[in-house]
Amino acid sequence: MSDRYELFLTCPKGLEGLLIEEAVGLGLEQAREHTSAVRGMADMETAYRLCLWSRLANRVLLVLKRFPMKDAEDLYHGVLDVDWQDHMLADGTLAVEFSGHGSGIDNTHFGALKVKDAIVDKLRTPTGERPSVDKLNPDLRIHLRLDRGEAILSLDLSGHSLHQRGYRLQQGAAPLKENLAAAILIRSGWPRIAAEGGALADPMCGVGTFLVEAAMIAADIAPNLKREQWGFTAWLGHVPALWRKLHDEALARAQAGLAKPPLWIRGYEADPRLIQPGRNNVERAGLSEWIKIYQGEVGTFEPRPDQNQKGLVICNPPYGERLGDEASLLYLYQNLGGRLRQACLNWEAAVFTGAPDLGKRMGIRSHKQYSFWNGALPCKLLLIKVLPDQFVTGERRTAEQRQVEREQAQAAADEAPVRQYNKNGNPIKPAPAPAPVVEQARLSEGGQMFANRLQKNLKQLGKWAKREGIECYRVYDADMPEYSLAIDLYQDWVHVQEYAAPKSVDPEKAQARLFDALAAIPQALNVDKSRVVIKRRERQSGTKQYERQSAQGQFTEVREGGIKLLVNLTDYLDTGLFLDHRPMRMRIQQEAAGKRFLNLFCYTATASVHAAKGGARSTTSVDLSKTYLDWARRNFSLNGFSDKNRLEQGDVMAWLDSCRDEFDLIFIDPPTFSNSKRMEGVFDVQRDQVQLLDLAMARLAPGGVLYFSNNFRKFQLDENLAARYQIEEITAKTIDPDFARNGKIHRAWKVTAR
């Protein structure tokens, strides 16, 4: 056999440039780049070294012969001419892979059969002994590639693809192949950062592929050091002594690398189902001293290396089905950008994404972009220096600043507008900022009295809201009977609900008073009239309470208790955030740490988001409406919370009846009345309270707490419940000053086991 061989190194599309640099560094000569491959010349030592050390190649193919081919007979005889007795035993096993078409070969299976037949015929002995086919673990894996009338016959030295390092026996739903992960790390500058003693963190680490590949690079570990079965193991041209020499050298380098102080390499994953598989992969790779994986949400990501060193944040955020709709993904990317700006200043970041447009929503410029392919999906690698001059997002005003501006009837010249999104989650270009002082309209005597009451309420409640950091609150609730309105502030927006007047009231007078109020509201609250939304609130029945009022599909981001929530001020009677339950949500946030939280009739799951913020071990939210569960999903994503927060669509009573899980903290806020095509029968809170609470208490873990609330003004708690459970009415503790004027806004109870 020759001392020098032609080699083909195959790789994923897009890695050719990196692979040729790596291969030349490992000794490949006369290297040339091809589509998804690199070609060059090497001796046997270099071929072995490429198998052992290439982090990027899929396969190392040793070319046995090239020959022209016009038809299937040329193929057969070209393969037959090879001295196969120099390569394998007559009783050995083989597998054949065929690629390309033409020259009478239009079916790769047929082409592979012709190659196999030629090899078998060449090696068949007079006694009938002949090679057999083993597609899984053959002694020799033969590859023939047909390229423009030329057949290239090769021996696959690698055996199984080199990306299969052996440590990743458990993986997530959409993993990166190991060699693609290594390529991303190399493009991201990790070898340089690691050589300088830098840190690495992955806020969405899945089962830890980036982490393991990064540690192997930093510790100088050959990626295939632990592989036991190779394509050359049973090859008759194999030189075992040469291979042992190279393997021993690689083993010594790995031992020396692992003897060094470990770098700080950490991964965080929201999905609790992936934590142990990720740790198992790390342990199989022998890197438990270098890598730690923790459960954590993107919204709380904050790398804190032991010596405060900087380094690389690298991640592969979802860009397909992992989180659901586009809006959820948008919020996730925005949240990732926010955490980079807030917690990773002076770090470098690398974001690998199949949705580059979402990458633009992170609020940080990328100084370099590289194109890759993840299978058949085109992707981009965005490289970022996390420095203030790279930030492209403005600062939001605080609640205190907004309240001062209201009190002083001024607006800051550089005010950042409230973020708004359409139903697809895309930002809406904000309207020009309103003038600092709202133009004064002539008010009637009644209108002036109404304005005075609004200003008085705003002054009193504004101080409380400022002190408590509350941005959304009720400023007026039918305080004056003739002006029967509920008025809520949502940051810089005013949400007005008109209570339908009784039939005894003259409709014309009621209309005139409404016009008086609408004229007074912008002046009294110092808002532009375009930011006042008016609705009529009537007694609701059935599903009417959930029907659309309009179809603008615009969502506004607000803040409450350290979290962000989406409200829709136009499309539904309610906005997606029940302001009267603010104290209950804060209570849940304070009590949720380490607990399994269940939210029944969850609406947009705002209480569940508070529970997640408070450190709940898990949250489960159940509602019949897909619309509100989609909204809930966006609320979670907006805060960087993800898969450990379950959203279940279904009839609550039926769901509870079939549920077998236990929960430590349960919140139930049912509607007064509900019916739907998707539920059996009709729900009536007064009639069905006993069945509802019995089913829910059956799911309460020992020592757990259930909170029950509803807003049916005539509701009476069934006396039989007090005999079964320890029940304490806590209504007064769940009403803030902005709802103190309406003592019947809701009632609430704390329920525990006796």
From Swiss-Prot:
<dbReference type="InterPro" id="IPR029063">
    <property type="entry name" value="SAM-dependent_MTases_sf"/>
</dbReference>
<dbReference type="Pfam" id="PF02926">
    <property type="entry name" value="THUMP"/>
</dbReference>
<dbReference type="InterPro" id="IPR000241">
    <property type="entry name" value="RlmKL-like_Mtase"/>
</dbReference>
<dbReference type="GO" id="GO:0003723">
    <property type="term" value="F:RNA binding"/>
</dbReference>
<dbReference type="Pfam" id="PF01170">
    <property type="entry name" value="UPF0020"/>
</dbReference>
<keyword id="KW-0489">Methyltransferase</keyword>
<comment type="similarity">
    <text>Belongs to the methyltransferase superfamily. RlmKL family.</text>
</comment>
<dbReference type="InterPro" id="IPR054170">
    <property type="entry name" value="RlmL_1st"/>
</dbReference>
<dbReference type="Pfam" id="PF10672">
    <property type="entry name" value="Methyltrans_SAM"/>
</dbReference>
<dbReference type="InterPro" id="IPR019614">
    <property type="entry name" value="SAM-dep_methyl-trfase"/>
</dbReference>
<dbReference type="InterPro" id="IPR004114">
    <property type="entry name" value="THUMP_dom"/>
</dbReference>
<comment type="function">
    <text>Specifically methylates the guanine in position 2445 (m2G2445) and the guanine in position 2069 (m7G2069) of 23S rRNA.</text>
</comment>
<dbReference type="Pfam" id="PF22020">
    <property type="entry name" value="RlmL_1st"/>
</dbReference>
<dbReference type="GO" id="GO:0070043">
    <property type="term" value="F:rRNA (guanine-N7-)-methyltransferase activity"/>
</dbReference>
<keyword id="KW-0808">Transferase</keyword>
<dbReference type="InterPro" id="IPR002052">
    <property type="entry name" value="DNA_methylase_N6_adenine_CS"/>
</dbReference>
<dbReference type="GO" id="GO:0052915">
    <property type="term" value="F:23S rRNA (guanine(2445)-N(2))-methyltransferase activity"/>
</dbReference>
<protein>
    <recommendedName>
        <fullName>Ribosomal RNA large subunit methyltransferase K/L</fullName>
        <ecNumber>2.1.1.173</ecNumber>
        <ecNumber>2.1.1.264</ecNumber>
    </recommendedName>
</protein>
<keyword id="KW-0698">rRNA processing</keyword>
<keyword id="KW-0694">RNA-binding</keyword>
<dbReference type="GO" id="GO:0005737">
    <property type="term" value="C:cytoplasm"/>
</dbReference>
<keyword id="KW-0963">Cytoplasm</keyword>
<keyword id="KW-0949">S-adenosyl-L-methionine</keyword>
<dbReference type="InterPro" id="IPR017244">
    <property type="entry name" value="23SrRNA_methyltr_KL"/>
</dbReference>
<feature type="domain" description="THUMP">
    <location>
        <begin position="46"/>
        <end position="157"/>
    </location>
</feature>
